[in-house]
């Protein structure tokens, strides 16, 4: 805020009002911290000592900031104090500040426990479990023991519980459920009572189902809410039809509303479940009124309204029938009773787990954060003289309890605070913004805030609600844009609160100069081309998703570069001037960390400096993956994947050809056996230089592995890890890699994790590796070690991580990221209010059925998800001070507009509830809201939007920009060194350098260096891994004789596109290419597949070929487009030829599609490389077919080349067949007697 700030009337009330409970609803940027500090100072002025206040903050950083601000404020008051008495007061308060109760609730609870531990007979000598991983490790250990205990009981009830939530492979599902249920229970003041209530929800009693509390309190209100939602759709349809003059459509919706009213009345009065079930299952709207003589536009509008609103209402009623009323009453009761038994057993198991976990923590003298809260509450509620004395002492001590970020508290924390609070009058001062409650995954309960928000506003309540609506952070365009979105999105139905006049942001940052640029932009990447693969490439299922992310990131980087390099301006609050944007002014916020690795790579490539504090998951970093692989093989070397990972890593340094060589020398058994076999059988005198080099590497590796394995048996895990660092030099090596400091910090962190593991009295490498693997499986990665923040770089963080922060320029990335609804598909749903809803798995039929409790829990989960995602979007938008950019991706502009136009005709300010609830990403919400503004017509003038009056009055400006692949293509070939700023900097350095004076001798030395030629320059351009087909394609005119002896002539001019053979310039990413028609290569591959799959019967018929081709298309091994191009007659003709008949005759001796790999010295393969060069090349390929007779082998290769002469086929493929022959003779130890090319196009065999 600007200097000379004056408090608003609402802020003044929040500072001065007293004698009651006060809830301050402080919108984003409203200065709530300033108000809290000023309230503390005001209390001190009134004679309250700072140690008589309890100030609870959400984080330790917030508590530290609060103390610092209070200290500054007290010093200011001291400097202006008139009397000695005042000065003494402020000096006394400054001296007490360090011991004042300004802390997180956990820190306050820890203080209570340390001071009053004797009340509950707690051993005061305990250590805090500050790491989540420590807690998880201990829980795993306790659960493993308890689970075995339950299994040994052979309890039928426990067996049913296991079967219901486990797979046929393991019981991880049950383990996860127990841990989550324990977590939910522990967020309550009385966990056992909450667990008991889980069971009581399933007790329907003996009365009819519709008389049960569950039906009356849960099902019936939900059913009526859904019917009302359908009715709201129909009413909106009536309004729209009426305004468009569609009389018959209006009449249709009018009669539909009447039908819905009848259904609503029936539900209210119905007393019998099966009657209601039958009514809903048979429910239909009456036939729509016929509407002739409409013009094209009216027809289009009618179709849209019917599809969106009438069909939507039908779907709502159908869902009621399917989800709630699928079963008759007796089956519902039976299902519920069986499910009750399972929930009862679950409750019992979780209670026992909680008791055992507590017992184990006491045994180890440790406490976790949950213990702090429960033990504090236990102390306060202990009904003994000591317990009652402690509670009264704390109540009398604190004249006021101030709670910051009140919306993020849970029921347990609320109970602790209200236990020591005064009742009449109240003395709680709670500050927060329920629109920023985004920690549902931590079991924060925004309902506590909402309940007070509504009740404190009523006239008959003694407590007070104060609203701080002014936003002193953002420019008017940002606040107006936020209001534009949320006034249409958020209400009690979808969002849990109304975004009304009380909730809207009020522009208060009047200190921005008028000339400060205004920007709010929506950037859409059109990903249509990115979902298409080139014709000769296999389809990767994740490809389109990855490239949507890449397209968004390139688009974002492009826009950021434009802002910085074009000198776009922002207002610098500290300097009080307008200046050009710098990278440090920009923050990228994302819903998840999923794309951080791509983001880091792309920004670096495009020359945009970036700081990503959590760029990748800790155990997904290269250095940690290598170390974990090493630890795995130290525990057990007979694991191929981690073994090869270590061998290939810098620790051992084997190349791909060396790895292949080891396997070729021993094709049976585990890979470690192949390594040992090579080492044990190595003969120095017969070894090539290649083998000798490999042997030396393996010898060092095996020596180190033996040493490490011996050390591991002594259970010295941390020492073992450090020994690996010392012996291999790996810690130093990663320090020299890009991001070396971060990598070294990560390796140090692994050492520290291992030390912590051992401190917990856990031993053994196997258990440590197993624990880490479990953590990764559950997506509970450890935190990455932190390093220094870059000075001038774009900051990247999650939206959750940005809460409480502000940035001049904000990019909300991946706004089309789908909300995570994966939990809804699990066989259980947990809810703090509704308990648990489960799916029941019939042990006999294996059929899974959702209980009514699961249906209710699902509805609640979706409602809470939508509300929390809405709040998350609010947090993201309100981080921006001056400029806001929202980034997303659609297939194309039409797809985006079609989704955004769904709600344009609604004249009410808030969009249709059903449409809002059905949305699964931020951008669809935002787009729907923007289309109703007149400004949007600049994007699409066909939008027939009904702009509500409030939106029209908003002083908002925004742009929507669409970027295609073509727009971004130039960005994909820009390297970071080619950025304009980098080039200018380098040129300036060169210009400032003084010219060097050199003598003749120095000149000759430099000249010799510059003119020298690397003797095997061609090898530098050659990959060590070659496909036979690539070798063939690399030469337009290979010398036949030299090919025969495997001396292939190198040509300096290599055809473009042979990028497997030559390490050429990088080609464009696949998403920058477009799909072309069916290629000959595709037809060739498909033809070979057909020949491979064809049964070798006595006679091959055309009908058989057609059936096989149809099957391959059905199995999606060949596309229908490619199948049309395959010439089946040519294949039939082949089997009537001499070669074809020989294949059929010797079908048991025929091998088809035979893969091979062999090592060939480069000097033998390439004619321009010296023959004595031992640099090996790994050649691999697939032989179409061979016939293995007693003492000879015939190899054959099908060719689908069109219009190619016999001589040209020989010229093109002789070398390839020679390589095949060499490979076959090496593998089978038999002479290849014939090498045959069969041309399907010519219909003849060509013997070489």
UniProtKB/Swiss-Prot annotation:
Residues 5-475 form the UvrD-like helicase ATP-binding domain. InterPro entries: AddA, DNA_helicase_UvrD-like_C, DNA_helicase_UvrD/REP, P-loop_NTPase, PDDEXK-like_dom_sf, PDDEXK_AddAB-type, Restrct_endonuc-II-like, UvrD-like_ATP-bd. GO terms for molecular function: 3'-5' DNA helicase activity; 3'-5' exonuclease activity; ATP binding; ATP hydrolysis activity; double-stranded DNA binding. GO terms for cellular component: cytosol; DNA helicase complex. ATP binds at residues 26-33. Its EC number is 3.1.-.-, 5.6.2.4. It catalyses: Couples ATP hydrolysis with the unwinding of duplex DNA by translocating in the 3'-5' direction; ATP + H2O = ADP + phosphate + H(+). Its cofactor is Mg(2+). This is ATP-dependent helicase/nuclease subunit A. It comes from Ligilactobacillus salivarius (strain UCC118) (Lactobacillus salivarius).
């Amino acid at each position: 805020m600007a200097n000379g700030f004056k408090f608003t009337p609402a802020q003044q009330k929040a500072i001065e009002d007293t004698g009651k409970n006060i809830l301050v609803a402080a919108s984003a940027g409203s200065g709530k911290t300033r108000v809290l500090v000023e309230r503390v100072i005001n209390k001190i002025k009134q004679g309250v000592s700072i140690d008589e206040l309890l100030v609870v903050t959400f984080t330790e950083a917030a508590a530290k900031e609060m103390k610092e601000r209070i200290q500054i404020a007290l010093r200011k008051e001291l400097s202006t104090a008139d009397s000695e008495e005042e000065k003494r007061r402020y000096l006394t308060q400054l001296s007490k500040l360090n011991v004042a109760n300004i802390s997180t609730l956990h820190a306050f609870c820890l203080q209570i426990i340390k001071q009053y531990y004797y009340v509950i007979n707690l051993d005061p000598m305990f250590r805090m479990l500050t790491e989540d991983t420590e807690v998880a490790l201990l829980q795993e250990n306790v659960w493993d023991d308890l689970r075995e205990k339950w299994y040994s009981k052979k309890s039928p009830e426990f067996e049913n519980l296991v079967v219901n939530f486990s797979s046929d492979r393991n019981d991880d599902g049950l383990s996860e459920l127990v841990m989550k249920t324990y977590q939910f229970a522990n967020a309550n003041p009385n966990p056992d009572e909450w667990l008991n209530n889980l069971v009581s929800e399933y007790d329907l009693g003996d009365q009819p189902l519709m008389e049960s509390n569950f039906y009356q309190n849960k099902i019936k209100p939900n059913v009526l809410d859904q019917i009302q939602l359908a009715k709201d759709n129909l009413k909106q349809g009536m309004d729209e039809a009426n305004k468009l003059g569609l009389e018959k459509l209006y009449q249709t919706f009018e009669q539909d509303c009447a039908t819905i009213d009848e259904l609503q009345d029936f539900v209210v009065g119905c007393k019998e479940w099966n009657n209601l079930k039958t009514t809903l299952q048979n429910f239909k709207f009456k036939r729509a009124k016929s509407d002739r003589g409409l013009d094209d536009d009216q027809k289009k509008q009618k179709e849209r309204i019917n599809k969106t609103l009438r069909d939507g209402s039908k779907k709502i009623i159908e869902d009621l029938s399917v989800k709630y009323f699928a079963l008759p009453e007796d089956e519902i009761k039976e299902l519920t009773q069986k499910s009750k038994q399972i929930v009862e057993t679950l409750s019992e198991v979780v209670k026992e787990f909680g008791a055992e976990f507590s017992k184990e923590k006491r045994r180890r003298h440790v406490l976790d954060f949950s213990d702090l809260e429960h033990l504090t509450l236990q102390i306060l509620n202990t009904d003994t003289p000591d317990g009652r004395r402690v509670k009264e002492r704390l109540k009398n001590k604190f004249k006021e309890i101030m709670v910051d970020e009140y919306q993020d508290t849970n029921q347990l924390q609320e109970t602790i605070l209200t236990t020591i609070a005064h009742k009449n009058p109240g003395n709680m001062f709670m500050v927060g913004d329920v629109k920023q409650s985004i920690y549902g995954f931590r079991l924060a309960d925004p309902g506590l805030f909402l309940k007070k928000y509504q009740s404190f506003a009523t006239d008959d309540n003694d407590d007070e609600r104060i609203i701080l609506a002014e936003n002193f952070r953002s420019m008017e365009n940002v606040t107006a844009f936020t209001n534009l979105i949320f006034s249409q999105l958020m209400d009690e139905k979808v969002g849990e609160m109304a975004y009304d006049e009380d909730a809207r942001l009020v522009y208060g940052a009047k200190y921005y100069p008028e000339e400060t640029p205004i920007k709010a932009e929506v950037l859409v990447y059109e990903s249509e081309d990115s979902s298409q693969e080139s014709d000769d490439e296999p389809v990767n299922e994740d490809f389109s998703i990855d490239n949507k992310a890449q397209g968004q990131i390139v688009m974002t980087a492009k826009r950021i570069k434009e802002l910085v390099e074009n000198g776009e301006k922002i207002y610098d609050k500290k300097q009080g001037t307008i200046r050009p944007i710098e990278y440090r002014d920009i923050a990228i916020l994302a819903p998840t960390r999923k794309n951080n690795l791509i983001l880091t790579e792309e920004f670096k490539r495009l020359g945009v400096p970036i700081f990503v504090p959590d760029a990748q998951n800790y155990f997904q970093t290269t250095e940690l993956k290598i170390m974990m692989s090493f630890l795995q093989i130290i525990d057990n070397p007979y694991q191929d994947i981690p073994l090869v990972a270590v061998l290939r890593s810098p620790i051992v340094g084997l190349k791909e050809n060396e790895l292949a060589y080891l396997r070729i020398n021993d094709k049976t058994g585990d890979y470690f056996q192949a390594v040992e076999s090579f080492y044990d059988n190595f003969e120095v005198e017969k070894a090539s230089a290649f083998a000798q080099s490999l042997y030396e590497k393996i010898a060092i590796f095996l020596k180190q592995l033996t040493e490490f394995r011996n050390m591991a048996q002594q259970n010295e895990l941390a020492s073992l890890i450090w020994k690996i660092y010392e012996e291999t030099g790996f810690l130093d090596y990663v320090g020299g890699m890009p991001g070396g400091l971060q990598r070294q910090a990560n390796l140090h962190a692994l050492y520290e994790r291992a030390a912590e593991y051992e401190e917990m009295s856990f031993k053994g490498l196997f258990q440590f590796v197993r624990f880490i693997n479990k953590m990764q499986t559950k997506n509970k990665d450890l935190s990455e070690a932190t390093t220094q923040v870059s000075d001038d770089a774009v900051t990247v963080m999650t939206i959750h991580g940005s809460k409480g922060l502000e940035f001049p320029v904000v990019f909300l990335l991946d706004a089309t990221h789908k909300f995570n609804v994966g939990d809804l598909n699990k066989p259980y749903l947990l809810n703090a209010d509704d308990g648990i809803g489960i799916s029941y798995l019939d042990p006999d039929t294996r059929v899974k059925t959702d209980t009514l409790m699961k249906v209710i829990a699902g509805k609640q989960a979706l409602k809470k998800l939508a509300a929390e995602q809405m709040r998350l979007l609010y947090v993201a938008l309100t981080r921006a001070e001056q400029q806001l950019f929202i980034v997303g991706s659609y297939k194309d502009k039409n797809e985006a507009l079609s989704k955004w136009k769904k709600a344009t005709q609604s004249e009410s300010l808030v969009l249709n509830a059903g449409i809002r609830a059905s949305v699964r990403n931020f951008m669809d919400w935002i787009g729907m809201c923007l289309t109703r503004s007149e400004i949007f017509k600049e994007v699409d003038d066909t939008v027939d939007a009904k702009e509500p009056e409030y939106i029209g009055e908003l002083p908002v400006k925004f742009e929507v920009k669409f970027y295609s692949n073509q727009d971004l293509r130039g960005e994909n070939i820009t390297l970071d060194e080619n950025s304009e700023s980098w080039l200018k900097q380098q040129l300036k350095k060169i210009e400032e350098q003084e010219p060097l004076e050199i003598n003749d001798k120095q000149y000759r030395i430099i000249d010799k260096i510059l003119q020298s030629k690397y003797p095997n320059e061609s090898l530098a351009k050659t990959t060590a891994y070659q496909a036979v087909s690539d070798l063939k394609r690399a030469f337009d005119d290979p010398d036949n004789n030299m090919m025969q002896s495997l001396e292939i002539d190198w040509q300096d001019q290599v055809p473009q596109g042979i990028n497997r053979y030559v390490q050429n310039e990088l080609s464009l990413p696949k998403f920058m290419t477009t799909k072309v028609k069916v290629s000959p290569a595709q037809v060739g591959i498909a033809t070979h597949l057909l020949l491979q799959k064809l049964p070798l019967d006595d006679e091959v018929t055309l009908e058989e070929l057609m059936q096989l081709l149809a099957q391959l298309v059905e199995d999606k091994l060949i596309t229908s487009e490619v199948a049309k191009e395959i010439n089946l007659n040519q294949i039939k003709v082949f089997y009537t030829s001499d070669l074809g008949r020989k294949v059929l005759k010797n079908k048991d001796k025929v091998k088809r599609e035979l893969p091979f790999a062999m090592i060939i010295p480069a000097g033998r393969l390439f004619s321009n490389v010296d023959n004595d060069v031992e640099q090996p090349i790994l050649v691999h390929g697939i032989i179409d077919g061979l016939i293995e007779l007693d003492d000879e082998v015939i190899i054959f290769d099908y060719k689908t080349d069109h219009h190619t002469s016999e001589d040209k086929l020989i010229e093109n493929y002789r070398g390839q067949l020679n390589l095949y022959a060499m490979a076959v003779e090496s593998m089978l130890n038999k002479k290849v007697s014939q090498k045959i090319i069969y041309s399907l196009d010519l219909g003849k065999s060509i013997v070489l």
